[in-house]
Amino acid sequence: MSSLKGKTAFVSGGTRGIGLAIAKRLASEGADIMVAGSSEANCAAATRAITAQSEGRIEAHAVDLRTLEGCQAVFDAHSRVFGGCDILVHSAGATRGGVFPDQDDADFIDGFALKFHAGVRLSRLFWPLLAAAHGNVVMIVGGASRTPDAKFMVGGAVNAALANFSKALAGQGLQDDVNVNWINPGQTETERLQQLLSTRARDENLSIDDVRAERMQAEGIRRLGQPEDTAALVAFLCGDEARHIHGAGIAVDGGATKGYF
């Protein structure tokens, strides 16, 4: 498939989990890719993995997206390499699990810095390039943005803020011809999910298998998602066939979300 051939994409958090799956999928459809990750080792591994299934140009940049300087640095790197940008995917931002009120301010500050503030900053920096290209923004948010969980307060608060920002950004996109959508992945088999399961198992003195089974039962789902499930939707949203989908938040959660909003 080459529906995105000639396009350039930037994927934050693109070295692991859902972000890596997104970068692979976009590259397999012909896009040139820059991914940003938190370490040189992750960036090197991601570059090898993406290059193995793509003939396009693949670049990776290790950076701390929690800071304005980090966001600026990765934007400058992308601009030097590619010049323009057709697709911005913000997938960075694992928040810390825990039980309130034991979680302190640092957990909330860190969560907002990496997922929310980085999303805002990257959108601001890349916006002129995206407007020039009549491009696409896809934010990877999360179902907790709509269904608060007392045991996932940091993630829920951050996700809700990012979803609200994404909807507002879509309004600006109507004026500047930039498509903006966001995705709410459900329980997805990643290292991040394993960390959350481990944290809850520790806090509640349960086994990880028990926590996993409890979570699936509570959400009424038959299976956990795979990163490729979300990646497939991102690729579709960035293609011409999805041009009239704008300002939408779409769940990829196996039916876990019970409401229809």
PLM segments and residue spans:
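Conserved glycine-rich cofactor-binding loop
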Residues: 8, 15-16, 39
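Substrate-binding pocket helix/loop in short-chain dehydrogenase/reductase
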Residues: 71, 99-100, 104-112, 215
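Short C-terminal tail/terminal secondary-structure segment
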Residues: 147, 235, 246-261
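A conserved structural motif in NAD(P)-dependent oxidoreductases
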Residues: 207, 219-230
